[in-house]
Amino acid sequence: MDRLIISPSPHIHSGDSVERNMYAVLIALAPACLVSLVTFGLGAFIVLAVSVLACVLTEWVITKYLYKQPSTIGDGSAILTGLLLGMNLPSSLPWWIIVIGAIVAIGVGKMSFGGLGGNIFNPALVGRVFLLIAYPAQMTLWPKAGQYFSYTDAVTSATPL
């Protein structure tokens, strides 16, 4: 070993592809998504669905019309970004704010740095931070968890007795 060989990462390789890793993370997040749906109801489903659809559509538009390259939505990274963004947002958030967050997450947080693997920050968190700065009132208004249950499990405050 007389020479120092410098090459771009990754330096350790496995048989897993990017697509396989992305979909494995999506499967791992499925239980958390189900719990959020049970806890926050239809609002959580709408936020997750709008976020995922907006992220996938934004990535498709940017790769097709701005970069003029084949679409990269098949790798699952836009779906994962949309899911992570949706899980970071209140379930009562209006759909148009979610779309703005998805556009910022994919457009600014991911694609402006060259796409998958080139971003310096997590794109979903870039979208969340932007929304928190742009819409602080809506982003800090969280609905009561478990309001869809018809019973009270415990009371943790003073009672009239």
Give residue spans per PLM region.
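N-terminal signal-anchor module of multipass membrane proteins
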Residues: 1-56, 60
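C-terminal ends of transmembrane helices
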Residues: 9, 57-69, 106-117
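Short, amphipathic, aromatic/basic-enriched membrane-interface segments that mark the entry/exit
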Residues: 12-22, 63-74, 91-93
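Hydrophobic, membrane-inserted alpha-helices
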Residues: 28-35, 59, 78-86, 102-106
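Transmembrane helix interruption/hinge and helix-loop junction motifs
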Residues: 38-45, 89-98
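Hydrophobic core segments of alpha-helical transmembrane domains in multi-pass membrane proteins
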Residues: 47-54, 97-105
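Cytoplasmic-side transmembrane-helix entry/capping segments in multi-pass membrane proteins
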Residues: 70-80, 97-103, 118-129
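Long hydrophobic alpha-helical segments that form multi-pass transmembrane helix bundles
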Residues: 117-161
